[in-house]
Amino acid sequence: MKSIDLKKLKLDKFKNVRVENFPKEFDLDIESTNNDVEVIIYYIDQLSDVGKFIKACTSSPLPKENRTILVYRKGRKDGVNRDSIFGPLRKDKRFTLKAPMLCSISDELSACVMGKIV
């Protein structure tokens, strides 16, 4: 399994994290839960996953202080990249960027940190 540095995502104050659509080859070292979710970490494998991410976040009763995190593979040449992923989200007023916004969490993965406006 490939390890990931989640410290950059600044999730220390959150206890309940739900992980969705993540490849088994990566070890997040987090116990995923569906109870009282405060953070959703969602892996984007194809562009259609952006809509699924939005649906997962908007249908979840997240608290006011929350994080919604998109993770995607770096250096892809198939059209799934930062700009194509964030295009729809820039227009969606239900989300706002949160620190650290965009960061590398491994040699292969990048993450964008947002919050759902509640």
Label each region the model flagged.
Residues M1-V118:
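Charge-dense, helix-prone N-terminal extensions
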